[in-house]
Amino acid sequence: MSPEVIRNLGWDLMSGSANAAVLGILVLGVRWLLRRHLSPDWRLILSGLVLVRLVWPWEIPSPVSLFNVTAPLLPPINSGSFPVDGWRWCLAAWAAGVVVRFAWVIADWRQLQQRIVRSRPAQSGLAALWNEAIQGESEFLRRVPILQSSEVSGPCLAGLIQPCLLVPPDLSEQFSKREIRLIFLHEMAHLRRRDLWLNVLLEAVRTVHWFNPVVGWVLRRWREDREEACDVHALSADRGVSKVLYGQVLLKCLESAAGLKADRVGVAWQGDPSSAPPSLVHRIQAIARFRSGRRTWVVGACTLTAVALLGLTDQEPLPPRRVWLLKKESILGLLPPLPGFPTV
């Protein structure tokens, strides 16, 4: 590649990731401050602004841009501020990290596919409960098979083209029919939201920006908010369910999943065991605060608009420096008279 291409590629990657990191810090702060007032769906949309910023192709100068505040704090650098050899080494290190993380994700995917191959159809009773949970839903959901696998400790969705629901063989012994119905309602919400495909998007972003910790934090919070959104769907779909019962089912699933590694390509009902207990505490608190029909769209829409105006716009260009041109007579008039010399 030519030196100009190397410079531009390295600069676009670094500056785009840095801008997304600044916006990500803002989103994480807003998310923490307004957690009780924003629904999980609105928090997901806010986190999505960080992904939008990563691929944002336009420069929109604005006086309210967040980068008007951050730009003066940083040194004035551009693609030409570093030698070409430095950009080459940086891009080589970045590409090596992408390859390693991509191989890691592929290994997880192959392991999950092997679990699907080694699984067997579930009992007819579980299939009947699934059909009851998805009653009135689309044909796509009715075609999702339920498979039993001794290699999973809790319900887990897997597969992109032909998704399936993996459950442990003793699911009927661990949970009552009412509890299994709640689990199925939660998993149905993941299918309706196309979360398996969103997993691919999140992992692709994480792979490209593996060096950016802020992007990693935002995506981790995205997964937590996604689980809370599916909790809300399950509680809303079964109006007679007790919030205490739902929380107990969640705790039982997490207890059985303790010590297990989370899959990057599957969606488990208990969420990511590696992020517990903070994630568990947030989910339990959200379940306790759940109220059917609660509307948060006013707060969500206003917050989204404000964060978008701050984070999707760019720094205004600095005003040009004024150069004062003075006439010769004006300059001489400013000088004090010197003794022994005639004045003009």
Residue ranges and their predicted role:
Residues 1-336:
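Hydrophobic topogenic segments
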